[in-house]
Curated annotation (Swiss-Prot):
This is UPF0758 protein SAOUHSC_01763. Keywords: Hydrolase, Metal-binding, Metalloprotease, Protease, Zinc. Pfam families: RadC, UPF0758_N. Belongs to the UPF0758 family. Zn(2+) binds at residues 163, 165, 176. A motif (JAMM motif) lies at residues 163-176. It comes from Staphylococcus aureus (strain NCTC 8325 / PS 47).
Length: 218
């Protein structure tokens, strides 16, 4: 049964037919929800076309009444909105303030230090963000190997390090600087540049690039 499979193996283990069957919920005499799902899928050439179906289109499928059609249409619209939001959230980084604007809302009130890596593609668009460490930043704890293995796995062209200072003071500590230099050196070897290290506190930030720590002569 689809519901039991979802509980035991997760939603990703279900076929399109099974996922639709859960939304349809109940069948009709002689037809299970799986049977109705199959008929529903046959009514459109693909999922994208099915998503565009109107309420009237949906109720033409045997076993789909008005309430089921409304449930399906609501689910399709929700999926569409989530997809649009994910696309809109992919930001392009052109300057340190872009990183700050993106990360300050989620990091400024954290009571513990979080070390986050932004993974960028060749156009400097953020393709993923991942928190690699929580706690007091220590250069011996933040391993370049772990960070760059993530970057390689996600096919990132560059990374930006971001971490917060719960105290609100955005002055780089000696550990911040050491960690930055280690990541920068490893990035040069691997061909995945560390573009910046941003420190966030309250509604302020410090860019180690703007502070001069990335200068070639340092």
């Amino acid at each position: 049964m689809p519901r039991e499979r979802l509980l035991s193996h997760g939603a990703k283990s279900l076929s399109n037919t099974e996922l639709l069957a859960i939304l349809i919920n109940t069948g009709r005499k002689g037809f299970s929800s799986i049977d109705i799902s199959n008929e529903l899928l046959k009514s459109a050439s693909n999922l994208n076309e099915l998503k565009k179906s109107s309420i009237n289109d949906l109720i033409k499928v045997k076993g789909i009444g008005l309430q089921k059609a409304i449930t399906l249409k609501a689910a399709f619209e929700l999926g569409e909105r989530m997809g649009r939001r994910a696309e809109n959230n992919r930001i392009k980084i052109t300057q340190p303030s872009d990183v700050a604007d993106y990360m300050i809302p989620t990091m400024k009130d954290l009571t513990q230090e979080h070390f986050v890596i932004l993974l960028l593609n060749s156009k400097n668009v953020v393709i993923k963000e991942t928190c690699v460490f929580k706690g007091t930043l220590n250069s011996s704890i933040v391993h370049p190997r772990e960070i760059f293995s993530i970057a390689v796995r996600e096919n990132a062209n560059a990374i930006i390090a971001v971490h917060n200072h719960p105290s609100g003071d955005v002055t780089p500590s000696q550990e911040d600087i050491i960690t930055t230099m280690r990541l920068k050196e490893c990035g040069l070897i691997l061909g995945i540049d560390l573009l910046d290290h941003i420190i966030i506190g309250d509604n302020r930030f410090t860019s180690l690039v703007e502070a001069g720590y990335f200068d070639e002569n340092d």
